[in-house]
Amino acid sequence: MNAAYAKAADANVLTIIKGGKKERTNSALKSDGKPKATAADPIRDIADVHELQNYFREKGQLRNYLLVTLGISFALRAGDLLSIRLMDVYGANWEVKKEFYLYEDKTNKRNRIHINSVSKQALEEYRGMIKAEKPDTTPLFTSRKRDADGKCRAITIQQLNHILAEARKEIGIEDHISSHTFRKTHAYHMIKESNYDSQVLYALQHGFNHSDIRVTMIYSGIEDDMVDEVKERMGSLLI
């Protein structure tokens, strides 16, 4: 039986009615089936990703370099990325772990995070800047500001957005980037590099908790590219 779509009370949630029962699901589509407006793009040109990484490294801002590297590699929501602690990624002797587990704040889903070779190298480089005596519950991405008890606290999503906005302006990246950009960039390049492989699409859909693959295509920005390509082909037919 085809699903009928009804307007949800929460504009960010799509309510699907199947067999008389309502199911709520996170979706990149509005209740009328049209894409939601988005405040962030993926970084489509991998050269821009490298330029963003190098921008922070050359300024000696290894925390921000690590944010970009892990943000795109791990494909976590910004809140989950900023919740990572030293003890999550470093072992007792400060060795970088191969993987760790994290409960997603939005879904409470237990997520296994693989630390790839580039992320490992970035974590090893960043390790020299850490002042903690041992890997503990200190946030990995610490702010200069302290909490009410004088303890280190993580940077906020607002601070992350400001950091990225300033870098975008300096570098001249055309894509609009914000805290959502990391996940979208991960999905965009995974799909492109795989040549739209169905297994990759399914893995991304499952990992992002999307209701179907088209939602993932919209979220990643791939569908926009496909529409642009079709329009370009149409243009080639005209005189």
What positions do the PLM features span?
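C-terminal catalytic core of tyrosine-transesterase DNA break-rejoin enzymes
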Residues: 73, 185-208
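Basic, Lys/Arg- and aromatic-enriched nucleic-acid-binding interface segment
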Residues: 46-74, 196
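C-terminal catalytic core of Y-nucleophile DNA break-rejoin enzymes
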Residues: 105-124, 137-165
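Short, polar N-cap/turn motifs at the start of nucleic acid-interacting alpha helices
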Residues: 89-93, 197-220
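Short hydrophobic short-linear motifs embedded
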Residues: 1-29
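Short pre-functional
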Residues: 65-79, 101, 188-193
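Catalytic-site neighborhood detector that most strongly recognizes the C-terminal catalytic loop/helix
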Residues: 104, 208-233
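Conserved tyrosine-mediated DNA breakage-rejoining catalytic core shared by Y-recombinases
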Residues: 2, 84-119
